[in-house]
């Protein structure tokens, strides 16, 4: 799998936290992330929560690739929730009606 800038990914960090973020840039040793959020299990399923409480939420952050244990493209439903949580835009998916 190749990692591409401009796409949203789920990352399991080496210390155990799961992060969802858009990768805006990458090089051989770092990922630059936009609006990273932590995945938190709750009674009604997973929730997305700010992962850096004291940082400017609009600032990009840099993560060392070596601190990422696993990375995968985000699931569509989680990606939709991420988009809504970070921009306020609620994606609309067209449904195919079968009759």
Model segments located where?
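Conserved RNA-binding domains used in RNP assembly and mRNA/RNA metabolism
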Residues: 2-99
């Amino acid at each position: 799998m190749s990692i591409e800038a401009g796409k949203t990914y789920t990352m399991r960090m080496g210390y155990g936290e799961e992060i969802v973020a858009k990768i805006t840039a990458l090089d051989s040793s770092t990922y630059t992330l936009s609006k990273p959020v932590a995945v938190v299990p709750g009674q009604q399923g997973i929730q997305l929560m700010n992962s850096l409480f004291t940082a400017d939420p609009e600032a990009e952050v840099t993560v060392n690739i070596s601190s990422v244990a696993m990375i995968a493209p985000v699931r569509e439903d989680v990606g939709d929730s991420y988009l809504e949580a970070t921009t306020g835009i609620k994606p609309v998916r067209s449904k195919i009606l079968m009759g």
